[in-house]
């Protein structure tokens, strides 16, 4: 693994049957998302500024005779196929010695533009890194699970190109920025949003730091997502009235975010949101 990844440099194997590992699957947001073109293979060429919130799902792993996965939490019921879950797939793609009993506490909404499943897989990669070390081809293994997974393994601000798997570092002058996530509790699958994109290339990312790129950027999937879930518009309008300096939709939606100058501004904004909406307040990593 690259030295700049921020992951633990030395393996920390299970020490006895009672030891457990715990990782947060940090919520992913796209501070900017520029879709450049449709590719012949059906995917899209894009440029995005990944950022991560200091909160998300929680995963725990304990030694067990065989791998297993238990899911609970507010959004656990949305994952009705544990064997098809990306956490189970991440376990299956990585050598990790004895079996692991993994518990996933699902706090992030599903199909929400937050990379929830990819973040969960990224947390598994970090747990395996701590306990056994990752194979040299970990990035390729992560990319096979999903376009956002390599970035979620690192869980640090970066630029993503190609389908999002080609990562580049960027000076992160947004770490610690107060952020509020809001979702109208309407799932929105990625495929239909990309299909509704108008195909117009509106240009590349611009800027030398995370703040500059975010401020100058846009989300090209916002308009197609709005055409499918008009309630996103109400979320954006409400957030823009709360004094944040940047409000935008994340990923393919329907979650939107606002960035603030102070935690007090963020907390007041969160308290002003309709109780029927899902919210999460935190800070950028």
From Swiss-Prot:
UniProt pathway: Isoprenoid biosynthesis; isopentenyl diphosphate biosynthesis via DXP pathway; isopentenyl diphosphate from 1-deoxy-D-xylulose 5-phosphate: step 3/6
EC number(s) reported in the record: 2.7.1.148
A single BP term in Gene Ontology: terpenoid biosynthetic process
GO terms assigned for molecular function: 4-(cytidine 5'-diphospho)-2-C-methyl-D-erythritol kinase activity; ATP binding
Source organism superkingdom: Bacteria
Keyword Manganese found: no
Name recorded for this polypeptide: 4-diphosphocytidyl-2-C-methyl-D-erythritol kinase
Native source species: Novosphingobium aromaticivorans (strain ATCC 700278 / DSM 12444 / CCUG 56034 / CIP 105152 / NBRC 16084 / F199)
